[in-house]
């Protein structure tokens, strides 16, 4: 399956994860197995942003569009960070863990989407999960990905508009 992931890009053109293991270099064209992030004493995962919910695996989207991630203006995300890019990724999708993950979100008769996840990497597969109520479209968490290529801003706009009916986030310049 093809999905999209946003990365930081350094001055040498190397890709890096946005938050967890943010200093690691991500190669293009090689299958990568997710690692569990370092846990805090409260059970969260350490990240560049500070502690985050523990949902181990590669986080990707069906669309190269993340209106919940970026540069804020007047309290709302308006732009992509200038040092980020979208990449087309192949997701290893032999096993779909979505039903198992969603079962974790059921408490009695109520469904809590923030709990509809796994506390382990989805070995040999993936599951659909929306990490943020402000996120767009369907997101997934996977064990393995291969970065096929970095997309140009023009390619991101083309995919967003023709496949999802939204314009790509503008990039913050300057």
Whereabouts are the PLM-identified features?
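Active-site and NAD+-binding cores of ADP-ribose-processing enzymes
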Residues: 1-45, 74-174
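Extended catalytic/binding region for NAD+/ADP-ribose chemistry, centered on the ART fold
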Residues: 47-72
């Amino acid at each position: 399956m093809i999905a999209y992931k946003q990365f930081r890009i350094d001055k040498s053109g190397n890709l890096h994860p946005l938050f967890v293991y943010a200093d690691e270099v991500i190669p293009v064209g090689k299958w990568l197995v997710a690692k569990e992030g370092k846990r805090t004493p409260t059970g969260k995962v350490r990240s560049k942003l500070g502690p985050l919910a523990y949902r181990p695996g590669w986080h990707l989207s069906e669309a190269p569009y993340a209106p919940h991630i970026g540069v804020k203006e007047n309290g709302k995300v308006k732009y992509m960070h200038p040092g980020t890019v979208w990449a087309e990724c192949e997701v290893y999708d032999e096993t779909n863990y979505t039903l198992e993950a969603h079962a974790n979100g059921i408490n009695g008769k109520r469904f809590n989407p923030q709990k509809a996840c796994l506390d382990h990497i989805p070995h040999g597969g993936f599951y659909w999960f929306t990490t943020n109520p402000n996120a767009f479209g369907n997101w997934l968490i996977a064990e393995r990905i291969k970065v096929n290529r970095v997309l140009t801003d023009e390619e991101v706009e083309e995919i967003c508009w023709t496949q999802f009916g939204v314009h790509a986030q503008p990039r913050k310049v300057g």
